[in-house]
Structure formats: structure tokens, C-alpha cells
Swiss-Prot record:
Belongs to the D-glutamate cyclase family. InterPro entries: D-Glu_cyclase, Putative_hydro-lyase, UPF0317. Keywords: Lyase. Its EC number is 4.2.1.-. It comes from Clostridium beijerinckii (strain ATCC 51743 / NCIMB 8052). The keyword Lyase applies. This is Putative hydro-lyase Cbei_2760. GO terms for molecular function: lyase activity. Pfam families: D-Glu_cyclase. The lineage of its organism: Bacteria, Bacillati, Bacillota, Clostridia, Eubacteriales. The keyword Membrane does not apply.
Length: 262
């Protein structure tokens, strides 16, 4: 089935019914996708401040009301506890489980943060003629923990996570221009070229997602990634945090064109 041409609400319904459980890259072309962080209210201000201080890695699209599983703006009929293909639960910084629903874990003090995802600009890259390798290879995007320190806020501190896409040399400028127009979904790359400069020792062994082929004449290009909060959570070890599983996003009703240059 070609999910790229489906409406976001249709795909969310399939996810809620358990009919889609894999990565969402390439789905609902032209619509923004969002990373998810759910944490107790007592940690919400610190995380909001962390996101504000690290807008490249954590560009906020929406924050929920306390205890609410619904959103007001980016996906009004969404259920935050059921409309993502796969969730991760961290307790004291340790990954304790992955679930297709977190309804059974929901608490009245939870606050949800929806963070822009680079999957959003992939349809723009494809439209501009720039290849997206993990879509070609039908796998998840490779993601790496770097040596780039995030700006700390409250209890939150740690290293930035990046996503990597191999780009032909002659299309790097185009890819920077296309993605730079969309700062709400990470914007321009944080690094282009030699992976070791940002602390990546083996480009074939991502910390999250899948390895992809880098062809002759291509260079690895790295964008800030909304999996950064998961790296931070593993570092600071709060009692409980729920996130999306890397590559498994909330598909919003917000069109890419509406968040360009914003």
C-alpha cells in the first residue's frame, strides 16, 4: 500500500488499529511529522526550557495540557497514547519496554511535547530531486549520538543526536537550501562530511535506526534529530519518560508549506 498519498488521519487510524507498526518515513507526503516526549508535570518546565535552548534538536510544534491525550493544533483528533506506531518507556534512564500503545501507562500528570521531525522535509528533498537513501532501501533513517553538547536546562543535559542522509556532492547546496526553509523540523544540517569530527567512529553502526549504503560521489550529511531527548533521558535518569521509538512518528495534519520559514 502506498502510504505516501494517504491523509494523516487515515494513517493515524491504521496505526491506532495496529495495522501499521513500522517507521513512518515517506508517509503522508507534504505533512509534518513529530517526535514525542511524555513526562510528568514536575519535569515539564525544565524540558520546555531545554527545548527552547536547543531549538535545532528540539523544535517544539505543540505542548499538550496536563493529563490530556489530545492536541489542540497539529492533529485535533489524535490520541497521543495510541496514534504512534511504537513507543518507548524509560524508567530511571533505562529502556524498560516498547509498546504499540501506552494507554495502560497513562497518568493524569503527564505532559506531551511534540517536536518537529526531519521526516517532514524528506518529501521536499524528493520533490527537488535529492535522493533519500533510507526510503530507497525501505528501512529506518540512521541516527547517531554525537560529541556535541546540548545547552543544559534544569535537570536536562547531554549529547545531541543526529540523523544522517547520504547526499551527492553536487546536490549538497540544494539539500541545505530545501531543509533550511523548514526550521520547525530541524532546518539546516549541523555537520557535513567527516563523521569523526562530531564523534561518530563508525558510520556503518548507527546508535538508532538502520545502516544505509553511501555510494561513490556521496557525502554523509547530518541533521539535528528529535531523538536527542532520548539520549538526554538516558543521561539524567528521570523516574519515567515515554517517547516515540526512533523512526516511529506522529503524523500531523500540519502541512509543510505552513511551517516553512517559521
Amino acid at each position: 500500500m502506498d502510504y505516501s498519498k494517504m491523509k494523516p488521519s487515515e494513517v493515524r487510524n491504521l496505526i491506532r488499529e495496529g495495522k501499521i507498526t513500522g517507521p513512518t518515513s515517506g508517509m503522508c507526503a507534504g505533512y509534518a511529522q513529530a517526535n514525542l516526549v511524555i513526562l510528568p508535570k514536575e519535569l515539564a518546565y525544565d524540558f520546555l526550557l531545554f527545548s527552547q535552548r536547543n531549538p535545532k534538536a528540539c523544535p517544539i510544534l505543540e505542548v499538550s495540557d496536563v493529563g490530556s491525550r489530545s492536541l489542540r493544533y497539529i492533529a485535533e483528533d489524535a490520541d497521543i497514547a495510541k496514534d504512534i506506531p511504537k513507543y518507548r518507556v524509560y524508567e530511571d534512564g533505562i529502556l524498560t519496554g516498547e509498546y504499540t500503545s501506552v494507554e495502560h501507562l497513562w497518568r493524569d500528570d503527564f505532559v506531551s511535547f511534540l517536536i518537529g521531525c526531519s521526516f517532514s522535509f524528506e518529501s521536499e528533498l524528493l520533490e527537488a530531486g535529492v535522493p533519500v537513501r533510507h526510503i530507497e532501501e525501505n528501512c529506518n533513517v540512521p541516527m547517531f549520538i554525537t560529541n556535541i553538547e546540548c545547552e543544559p536546562a534544569g535537570i536536562f543535559n547531554g549529547k545531541m543526536v543526529v540523523s544522517m542522509r547520504p547526499i551527492p556532492y553536487d546536490q549538497i547546496v540544494k539539500s541545505v537550501m530545501v531543509t533550511g526553509a523548514m526550521p520547525k523540523v530541524h532546518g539546516t544540517p549541523i555537520h557535513i562530511g567527516e563523521p569523526s569530527v562530531i564523534g561518530i567512529s563508525d558510520i556503518s553502526k548507527p546508535d538508532f535506526g538502520d545502516s544505509v549504503n553511501i555510494k561513490e560521489g556521496e557525502v554523509p550529511v547530518f541533521w539535528p534529530c528529535g531523538v536527542t531527548p532520548q539520549s538526554v533521558v538516558m543521561n539524567v535518569k528521570p523516574k519515567i519518560v515515554i517517547t516515540h521509538s526512533p523512526g516511529h512518528m506522529l503524523i500531523t495534519d500540519t502541512k509543510n508549506i505552513d511551517i516553512k520559514f517559521s
